[in-house]
């Protein structure tokens, strides 16, 4: 009956996480605009901490996420880079770079 043991483990983990989320209720709407904004900002900061803690609990209690399948990476010794073609220079392009056209007379 290994399935029941896994179910009990999952239910226990969900209870722990529910208690964790219940410990950080959404702030009330009373007070000035600035006070409400500050309470919501602090609540969001705590909520991010609760989210991180809940994911760590899930990872520890349930064995963590499954690893992705192994991807074949090509051999880096076969990697080569082709040289870039030189762009054709135009007179307006040279003037934009601050060079003067040469007068060979």
Swiss-Prot record:
Q: What is this protein called?
A: Protein Rev
Q: What is the species listed in this Swiss-Prot or TrEMBL entry?
A: Simian immunodeficiency virus (isolate TAN1) (SIV-cpz)
Recorded superkingdom: Viruses
Subcellular location, in the record's words? Host nucleus, Host nucleolus; Host cytoplasm
Q: Where is this region: Disordered?
A: 23-48, 62-105
Q: List UniProt keywords, sorted A-Z.
A: Host cytoplasm, Host nucleus, mRNA transport, RNA-binding, Transport
Q: Is the keyword Transport in the record?
A: yes
Which residue stretches does the UniProt record annotate as biased composition, category Polar residues?
87-105
**Which residue intervals are annotated with compositional bias (Basic and acidic residues) in the record?**
69-83
Q: What is known of its domains?
A: The RNA-binding motif binds to the RRE, a stem-and-loop structure present in incompletely spliced viral pre-mRNAs. This region also contains the NLS which mediates nuclear localization. These overlapping functions prevent Rev bound to RRE from undesirable return to the nucleus. When Rev binds the RRE, the NLS becomes masked while the NES remains accessible.
Question: Could you give the subunit structure recorded for this chain?
Answer: Homomultimer; when bound to the RRE. Multimeric assembly is essential for activity.
Q: Where is this motif: Nuclear export signal?
A: 79-92
Biological process according to GO: mRNA transport
